UniProtKB/Swiss-Prot annotation:
Its main location: plastid. NDH is composed of at least 16 different subunits, 5 of which are encoded in the nucleus. This is NAD(P)H-quinone oxidoreductase subunit 1, chloroplastic. Its EC number is 7.1.1.-. Keywords: Chloroplast, Membrane, NAD, NADP, Plastid, Plastoquinone, Quinone, Thylakoid, Translocase, Transmembrane, Transmembrane helix. Pfam families: NADHdh (PF00146). GO terms for biological process: aerobic respiration; photosynthesis, light reaction. It comes from Acorus calamus (Sweet flag). The gene is ndhA. NDH shuttles electrons from NAD(P)H:plastoquinone, via FMN and iron-sulfur (Fe-S) centers, to quinones in the photosynthetic chain and possibly in a chloroplast respiratory chain. The immediate electron acceptor for the enzyme in this species is believed to be plastoquinone. Couples the redox reaction to proton translocation, and thus conserves the redox energy in a proton gradient. HAMAP family: NDH1_NuoH. PANTHER family: NADH DEHYDROGENASE SUBUNIT 1, NADH-UBIQUINONE OXIDOREDUCTASE CHAIN 1.
Length: 365
C-alpha cells in the first residue's frame, strides 16, 4: 500500500509539473508572438519608407527611380541590404574595436525599444505604461551615445567630429521635444500613450492636440526632424564637410545598421506625432457619416484592429511624406544656425507653450 501511494503521488506530481510546464510554454509563446509580429511590421514599414523616399526623391528630381528590383522597384531595399550583408566588415587598425562595434548596435536597439509604448490600435500596444511618452524620450536619448562611441572608436577626425555633432544636436533638440511632450501630458492628465489618444477622442476631430497645441505641434515637428538627423538637420554626416561623419570608417552590415537606425527613428517619430497630435487610431472625421463602421475599432475584433492599424499608419505616413519632401527641397543648415535654432528659438517657444498650457489647466480647475 505504501508503494502504491508513493507511485500515485509521483504520478500526480509529474502531471502537475507537466501541466505547469505546458502553461509556461503557452505563456512564452503568447509573449513572443506579439513581439515578433511587431518586429515584422517594423521591418515592412522601414522597407516601405525606403521605397517611398526613392520614389518621391525621383519625382522631385524628375527622374525614374528604382524600377528593376521587383514590381515598381519595391525590392530594391532588400537587394541593397543583401549586398551590405555579404560585403567585407573592415575594422580601423588603430581604433577602439569594442566601441566601434557597439556603436551601431546601440543606435538600432535603443530605437527599437521605443516601439514598445506605441499603440497601433485599441489595446494594440506591447507596454501600456503610465510613463510611456517619457520612456520614449529617455530611450531615444541613448542613441546619440552610440553615435559618439562610433565616432570616437573610429580614430578618425571626421568621424569624431560627426559624433560630437550628433551629441550636441541631440541635447539641443531633446529639451524642446520634452517640453512639448510635457505640455501634452498636462493637457491629457496622463503620460500613457493610450490615455493621450483616448483624451483626444472625446471631442472628435477638433479634439486633436494638433488644434489644441498648434505651437507645440510645430516645435515637436521641427525637433523630431532634428532628432532624426534628416536634411536640413543632417550636420553629423554632412558629406561636404565630414565625408560621412561618424559612418566614415564603417563598411558592410555595420554601415547598413546606421541607415536602419535612421529609418527606424523616422518611423517612430512619425508614429509619435500621430499618437500625440493626430488622434492615434481614431479617424474622427467620418464618425458623423459612418459611425457603425469606424466605431468598431474600439470594440476589438480583427476588423476593428485592422481599421485602427490602417488609420494609425495612414497618419504616420502622411508625416513621413512631409519629412521626405523636406529633405529633398531644403538646403542644409550650418552648425551655428542649427544650435541657434534649438537654443534661441525652439527652447523659449516650447517653454512659453508649457507655461500657457499650465496656466490654462490651472484656470480650468
Amino acid at each position: 500500500m505504501i508503494i502504491a501511494t508513493t507511485e500515485i503521488q509521483a504520478i500526480n506530481s509529474f502531471s502537475r509539473s507537466e501541466s505547469l510546464s505546458l502553461k509556461e510554454v503557452y505563456g512564452l509563446i503568447w509573449l513572443l508572438v506579439p513581439i515578433f509580429t511587431l518586429i515584422l511590421v517594423i521591418i515592412i514599414g522601414v522597407l516601405v519608407i525606403v521605397w517611398l523616399e526613392r520614389e518621391i526623391s525621383a519625382g522631385i528630381q524628375q527622374r525614374i527611380g528604382p524600377e528593376y528590383a521587383g514590381p515598381l522597384g519595391i525590392l530594391q531595399a532588400l537587394a541593397d541590404g543583401t549586398k551590405l550583408l555579404f560585403k567585407e566588415d573592415l575594422l580601423p587598425s588603430r581604433g577602439d574595436i569594442s566601441l566601434f562595434s557597439l556603436g551601431p548596435s546601440i543606435a538600432v536597439i535603443s530605437t527599437l525599444l521605443s516601439y514598445l509604448v506605441i499603440p497601433f490600435g485599441y489595446h494594440l500596444v506591447l507596454a501600456d505604461l503610465s510613463i510611456g511618452v517619457f520612456l520614449w524620450i529617455a530611450i531615444s536619448s541613448i542613441a546619440p551615445i552610440g553615435l559618439l562611441m562610433s565616432g570616437y572608436g573610429s580614430n578618425n577626425k571626421y568621424s569624431f567630429s560627426g559624433g560630437l555633432r550628433a551629441a550636441a544636436q541631440s541635447i539641443s533638440y531633446e529639451i524642446p521635444l520634452t517640453l512639448c511632450v510635457l505640455s501634452i501630458s498636462l493637457l491629457s492628465n496622463s503620460s500613457s500613450t493610450v490615455d493621450i489618444v483616448e483624451a483626444q477622442s472625446k471631442y472628435g476631430f477638433w479634439g486633436w492636440n494638433l488644434w489644441r497645441q498648434p505651437i507645440g505641434f510645430l516645435v515637436f515637428l521641427v525637433s523630431s526632424l532634428a532628432e532624426c538627423e534628416r536634411l536640413p538637420f543632417d550636420l553629423p554626416e554632412a558629406e561636404e564637410e565630414l565625408v560621412a561623419g561618424y559612418q566614415t570608417e564603417y563598411s558592410g552590415i555595420k554601415f547598413g545598421l546606421f541607415y536602419v537606425a535612421s529609418y527606424l527613428n523616422l518611423l517612430v517619430s512619425s508614429l509619435f506625432v500621430t499618437v500625440l497630435y493626430l488622434g492615434g487610431w481614431n479617424l474622427s472625421i467620418p464618425y458623423i457619416f459612418i459611425p457603425e463602421l469606424f466605431g468598431k475599432n474600439k470594440t476589438g475584433g480583427i476588423f476593428g484592429m485592422t481599421i485602427g492599424i490602417l488609420i494609425t499608419l495612414a497618419k504616420a505616413y502622411l508625416f513621413l511624406f512631409i519629412s521626405i519632401a523636406t529633405r529633398w527641397t531644403l538646403p542644409r543648415l550650418r552648425i551655428d544656425q542649427l544650435l541657434n535654432l534649438g537654443w534661441k528659438f525652439l527652447l523659449p517657444i516650447s517653454l512659453g507653450n508649457l507655461l500657457l498650457t499650465t496656466s490654462s489647466q490651472l484656470v480650468s480647475l
